[in-house]
Amino acid sequence: MATKLSEKKKVLVGMSGGIDSSAVCMLLQDQGYEVLGITLRMWDIPSHFSTPGQKEPDHVLEARSLAERLAIPHYTLDVRDEFRKTVVQSFIDEYLRARTPNPCVMCNLYFKWKYLLDEADRLECDYIATGHYARITQNMNRYILEKGLDPKKDQSYFLWRLGQKELSRTLFPLGISQKKK
């Protein structure tokens, strides 16, 4: 089966400023993709800012700095209000109903992928990519979410609600690798 990594050319990478999303950018560049980066600014707390008076959190600055070093465009999307309304409020509501919420599952489907795909469309990207350790295969014209090859890093559980629309446009380059310490 051919891998999705060689089908299209332009990909929008969700960049956290961390090692995994940075590795994704470099891997996709090495594979010949035109890479663009985006950081979703979802939540600010004081520990996100290393310098008093700093206008943007460290992870945004780190993602932008990496994008500059890789010579790729970088965008920041401020979605703090929507994150509070969509993900945080749902988390609170579930606790008030005496349920155990899983905010990552809700965030990925109803929040991250929504914004990443909307921005990918706006920027005319064929795919989005993230640093999640999961894989996507195709069988009988259906996309199937599978566990990442590294059992210690597998993140497919947090992505289980993604549907065909989302999976058909998503790349997980790290899902086929083992994370080194």
Tell where the protein language model's regions lie, with residue ranges.
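ATP-dependent adenylation/nucleotidyltransferase module used to activate substrates
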Residues: M1-R161, L171, S177-K181
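A short, charged helix-loop
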Residues: K165-R169
